[in-house]
Amino acid sequence: MRKIILSFAACLALAAYGQKPVQDTRAMDTFIDQLMGKMTLDEKIGQLNLSGGGVPGILSGSEGADETIRRGWLGATGGSELETFRKLQEIAVKESRLGIPLLFGLDVIHGYHTIFPIPLALSCSWDTTLIEQSARIAAIEASSNGVTWTYSPMVDIARDARWGRIAEGSGEDPWWGGKIAAAMVRGYQGDDLTKENTILSCLKHFALYGASEAGRDYNTVDMSRIKMFNEYFPPYKAAVEAGCATVMSSFNLVEAIPATGNRWLLTDLLRDQWGFDGFVVSDYNSIGEMTNHGLGDTQTVSALALHAGLDMDMMTNGYITTLKKSLEEGRVSQADIDQACRRVLEAKYKLGLFEDPYRYLDADRAKKNTFTDKHMNTARHIAGKSIVLLKNDKGLLPLRKTGTIAVVGPLADKKVELFGTWCGIDTAKSASVVQAVKEMVGNKARVIFAKGCNLTNEPMLAKASGLKVDPVENTRLVKEAVEQVKDADRIIAVMGEPNNWSGEACSRADISLPESQKELLRALLETGKPVVLVLANGRPLTLEWEDSQFSAIVEAWHGGSAAARGLVDVLFGDVNPSGKLTTTFPRSVGQIPLYYNAKKTGRPMNPDDHFTSKYLDITNDPLYPFGYGLSYTTFSYGDLQLDKTSVQGENGVLTASVQVTNTGKLEGEEVVQLYIGDPAASISRPMKELKNFQKISLKPGESRKVSFTITPEDLKFYNSALEYIWEPGLFNIYVGTNSRDVKSAQVTWNK
């Protein structure tokens, strides 16, 4: 096996530090200095190229990719096949001049082979341990199958449910988004990147991608810096502080300059202010798309991106085809190219690829570590913890395992549709909801199934998702379902979105359930039988009619490989739901963007005053607020107690406490949430902001005092000069079960 010839000193360093050679950056620097001293300009530029094949106009055809690697013109590529990775790595190591190994990247967003709930659902667990565990398992499986680099976590703050990629993020709150971002980075990268079960993480999409205008993917973004720093940047910064190895630029504009070519964003902020020391990769063809933004031809935008601090070009082939010419013309410098090349080589070094290029390419390890029963059991547990109980007015849930249970709906007998966006799908160990219900009740109850309706009969939506429109069939299906459920004691109606209605390029202007599904729901209500409405979806939906009609509503999201079994664990009470929403559910799409931590208005809503901030046809408040979620038991909150009403100085500490009691008949978990409001500051501040929470478990009748420690760090924000400070004054402290239903008290904090 051909490897790069290491210097004697570098070899000693690698041996001395065993699995942690990067502990001594001098050894890494020495190694890379010597390697780059041997590299030609073409080979250096080649390290900056992430492509799936040959180079247009130079190498093409079936042998294009192989020859590109032999010439040293490829630094990374994508894919998901272990055998292919092995073949390509052997070409890179054995047949290229210097034997530099490749990186293999893949969108491992919420699992590799064992698929966990979509990230939006994961965030509703309010459990960073489980979230980190899901990323750890994803890294174990991906690394066992040749993947060295995941394009995750996506940490974009999203306040617009029309945007399909809201499914890939952690909701609307910057503080909680930051905690999740750090947990995902830890899960992927572990505590030592040289271990064979770790992979490079990639923070994305930097920056502001979740603020696309009108919720339309790839659309423009226009935002003040003060809003960026206070409301959108915290999760990105948290991922950097957690040590994310790479960053992906976003498609959108940032201050009228594409993020991919924005030096203030990629260098001044990311590197100089935040201290990021990894490499930055473009999103798919986002260098080329700068031409569509109006910034010039491929050569011009490629030079602009490199100068901005964009190290690797994904799929544009702009760097590999134009940077050499740009260097000759003085558009880029040799230092720019060398710096980008060094950053890519450092990532490979930190992974241990120069020591063993095949460390991720072990078929036996792939077989042993992939899609195991242990991983599936964990996925089932996490799926159950991610479910949010939206309504249970008449105690219909949990269901009894007796009588006749009808499972109805266009998603009731599906598996693939429950996995969610961005995932490889293997249904071998998965179940449909019908199958999972049958497994749960065994011979204790009879289970019947009816499809009931089409997913949609709306022409554009059906065409976009490969469905046919047939209103006549829908009417027939509804009638058949009504006939089939006539002997049922209870009905489980599984409605929502298939997996290809959310994710990239899946924006929806109407986020209600399609009329075809509502036709079935109306017919089921007319039977007079108890109906549990189960929602499988990748975004918040508008559910005002459903909320007014159904006694029990369960938000199951797209739950991954174990979606159905995790769901029935909740439906039948094996798991008491404890999930809480991390994104606001609007009453109408016309309220969007709608989020809990909004700014004040000069004319707060007053229903008796016409000239105040409100709608004529709907209330301002959401249907379900941020932090909302019910349990099969009930909890009561005592008054909020502060240990003092006045606090002094930087070192001051305030303790806020509340007594929480389980007033129901079942043991359950409650997410006790702390919010702080700053009613008078140098700039207008949000009405309240999440600052902490505790997830507690209480037995029936048990009571516990829950306390939060508050310091000036919890009061800080970016002021008009973008200084991260806290200001003295009066503060509102809130503790409660969600962002709307809280206990409150006030404290004065003096300098």
Model-found features: residue ranges?
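Bacterial Sec-dependent N-terminal signal peptides
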Residues: 1-23
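Glycoside hydrolase catalytic-domain context in secreted enzymes
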Residues: 16-719, 725-741, 748-751
